């Protein structure tokens, strides 16, 4: 086992989780802010806005989970590290 490959796998796993969390984090903050603004403008549409927001947040969170899966694969199922 090459120590360089093992170190690169750990660095890549950290980058995978970190970079996969940036986009959805920004998107979730923006979506929540827009939803609060929409509810403030139209309180009667609160239920519809909230349902759409929760569905959107679930899809955004899936992207972060994909990054976590890639990181776990790099750490524990890496074919280059024996």
UniProtKB/Swiss-Prot annotation:
SUPFAM superfamilies from the UniProt entry: F1F0 ATP synthase subunit C (SSF81333)
Name of this chain's protein: ATP synthase subunit c, chloroplastic
Site (Reversibly protonated during proton transport) location in chain: 61
Other comments on record: In plastids the F-type ATPase is also known as CF(1)CF(0).
Keywords for this protein: ATP synthesis, CF(0), Chloroplast, Hydrogen ion transport, Ion transport, Lipid-binding, Membrane, Plastid, Thylakoid, Transmembrane, Transmembrane helix, Transport
InterPro entries named in the record: ATP_synth_csu_bac/chlpt, ATP_synth_F0_csu, ATP_synth_F0_csu_DDCD_BS, ATP_synth_F0_csu_sf, ATPase_proteolipid_c-like_dom, F/V-ATP_Csub_sf
Transmembrane segments: 3-23, 57-77
């Amino acid at each position: 086992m090459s120590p360089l490959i093992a170190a690169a796998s750990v660095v890549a796993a950290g980058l995978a989780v970190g970079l996969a969390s940036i986009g959805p984090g920004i998107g979730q903050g923006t979506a929540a802010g827009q939803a609060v603004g929409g509810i403030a403008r139209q309180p009667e549409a609160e239920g519809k806005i909230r349902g759409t927001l929760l569905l959107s947040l679930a899809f955004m969170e899936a992207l972060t989970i994909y990054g976590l899966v890639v990181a776990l694969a790099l750490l524990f199922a890496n074919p280059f590290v024996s």
